[in-house]
Amino acid sequence: MIDLYTWHTPNGRKVSIMLEEIGMAYNVFPINIAKDEQFQPHFLEVSPNNRIPAIVDKENNNYSLFESGAILMYLAEKSGKLINKSNSDEYYRTIEWLMWQMGGVGPMFGQVHHFVKYNKGKSAYAEERYSKEARRLYAVMDKRLGQHQYISGKEYSIADISIWPWTARFDWQEIDLSEYKNVTRWYTEMADRPAVQKGWLVPQNDQLIPSP
């Protein structure tokens, strides 16, 4: 059993989607970041960086882990699913694109959300800088998905799970997904997965998955 500390953000949804995909039982502990609940002492014990998501593996001596990418890798290895260790190319492509998301998509899209959605008009320079970088990243993704069905290649993996929740906020980024036909194809296929639909709703929200 996994204890999941999360909120309905892209990083939080990665882990709930992953848990649904691998069929692993989990308890949900909502951490409302709008109310600064991530700074409560009990959560600090699980996540020293005061950020969601975080997990505690009750079956592994209450082993705790934070950082969404690390959690995805842990759950993939624990379950033996969504990361192909028998195919070295597929395995390292998965890690490669997971790191691409962690180092590029997450930080850059997050800055777009901050300057374009929440602080629009306060810094034309920041809006242009981060929006331009977001479009570049979408173009990189579009090219990759024009060559392969999934981000890693032939197989659905944690790389797809890590990236998809960030693209699901294309409206926050003022991105027209129709400009990226391969991303749109992949995004729609992902949105149709039952596990993605279930994981999207964690914790307790009724937000619809945005349609491109």
Describe the function of each predicted region.
Residues 36-37, 93, 188, 207-209:
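Short secondary-structure boundary/hinge segments and terminal tails
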Residues 1-128, 142:
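GST-like domain detector, emphasizing the conserved glutathione-binding G-site
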Residues 196-212:
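Terminal-tail/helix-coil boundary detector
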Residues 32, 158, 203-206:
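Short, solvent-exposed turn/loop segments enriched in Gly/Ser/Thr/Pro and often Arg
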Residues 45, 163, 192, 201-202:
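Phosphate-coordinating loops and pocket residues in cytosolic domains that bind phosphorylated ligands
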Residues 28, 84, 154, 179, ...:
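A generic structural-conservation signal
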Residues 75, 97, 101-194:
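GST-like fold's C-terminal all-alpha helical module
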